[in-house]
Amino acid sequence: MTSNTPVSDQLFDRARSLMPGGVNSPVRAFGSVGGTPKFMVSAKGAYLTDADGKEYVDLVCSWGPALLGHAHPAVLDAVHAAVDRGLSFGASTPDEANLAAIVKDRVSAVERLRMVSTGTEATMTAVRLARGFTGRNLIIKFAGCYHGHLDGLLAAAGSGVATLALPGSAGVTEATAAETLVLPYNDLAAVEAAFAAHGKNIAAVITEAAPANMGVVTPGEGFNAGLSRITKEHGALLILDEVLTGFRTGYAGYWGLTGRQEGWAPDLLTFGKVIGGGMPTAALGGRADVMDYLAPVGPVYQAGTLSGNPVAMAAGVATLTNATPEVYAYVDARSLELSAALSSALDAAGVDHSIQRAGNLFSVAFGTSAHGVHNYDDAQRQESFRYAPFFHSMLDSGVYLPPSVFEAWFLSAAHDDAAMNRIVDALPAAAKAAAGASA
């Protein structure tokens, strides 16, 4: 079979001789869908262009950051101006406080904010901070929730770990793993039991605000509020991981859509992706008394040469300034439109499925209409073999989907009628391909 992207093929062959698996993040290798990954050379609005000159409507959006669309003029202008002033100073800059003020204004649970460069750094620091603040060692996480690649939270992780069917990661010591209690998601009774057995030693519960790394999973009614109640009762902290959902699912993140109205707040939150507008930026924030345990005012150490990088801060300020309530309303409407079209095409092809949704994020789970997906076990039981032919049919039609059934679909403010029509027109053939798949 002749490839229709020979330049990407050549680039991948070269990359495999230079980098493990030819990639710098495993999901990019197309491991669960097969075929050669496409090498992208440019992005504009709702579109990606690969090294062979082929254009795709993008439903990955850089895994979330491109909320406004790729290469948004206001973001580019801010970045260009920042670059002209210098790339990195090794000192504080005005936009660090400007971005922190925007986050604090939008997310009332944030009283202090610390900038870092990656989501993994944010969750790693939040866990260290929780242990330092409480004087306890154990952390509760949920199977299928992904919090970056720090050792203690890779047990039963979602995302690329789920894609590769790995239970965790080699290189994580037994002693490190023993300090993490892994519980089933959406099961408050299991959380209550864990605190009954280990409560005096539990520093924190960490959870994705709405999981999106085992496919999208909606927190059950009262689940996150219940975590807040239980942690408070036992003197532990609740860490809400909004690296993916923060400023993507809503103006104040997923907590702003749900928790604020329900009357509870996490002790710490982590942010990434959208907060940097496509630049490597992340943050952790929360209660002032907890955050002030960080150095230089507290005993918990954290540092980073490129934390608060001026170019990244400029991109973040421009992105959040332009991410208005109207933008979220538009993306929400497009998300509902596309998920309805997806479900209709799968129904017409006779493919059993459920659409999993959290705000404007959604994913499809095959063979799950009877029970849906509420936790990691449900996600693993789906007919995931149907996704690869579905993915490649869409790819051949010029639509770039996440190369894993365990990832969310992302839309942006740049997905106009032309982009949406191209996606919708490609769905019937992809649905038929999924229908014809066999395990």
Curated annotation (Swiss-Prot):
Entry keyword set: Cytoplasm, Isomerase, Porphyrin biosynthesis, Pyridoxal phosphate
Catalytic reactions of this protein: (S)-4-amino-5-oxopentanoate = 5-aminolevulinate
Transmembrane segments: none
Pfam families reported for this sequence: Aminotran_3
This enzyme's EC code(s): 5.4.3.8
Cofactor(s) listed in the protein's UniProt record: pyridoxal 5'-phosphate
Protein location: Cytoplasm
Residue list for modification N6-(pyridoxal phosphate)lysine: 273
GO cellular component, one term: cytoplasm
InterPro entries: 4pyrrol_synth_GluAld_NH2Trfase (IPR004639), Aminotrans_3 (IPR005814), Aminotrans_3_PPA_site (IPR049704), PyrdxlP-dep_Trfase (IPR015424), PyrdxlP-dep_Trfase_major (IPR015421), PyrdxlP-dep_Trfase_small (IPR015422)
Single biological process term from Gene Ontology: protoporphyrinogen IX biosynthetic process
Family: Belongs to the class-III pyridoxal-phosphate-dependent aminotransferase family. HemL subfamily.
Oligomer and partners: Homodimer.
Protein name in UniProt: Glutamate-1-semialdehyde 2,1-aminomutase
Protein species of origin: Paenarthrobacter aurescens (strain TC1)
High-level lineage: Bacteria, Bacillati, Actinomycetota, Actinomycetes, Micrococcales
GN (gene name): hemL
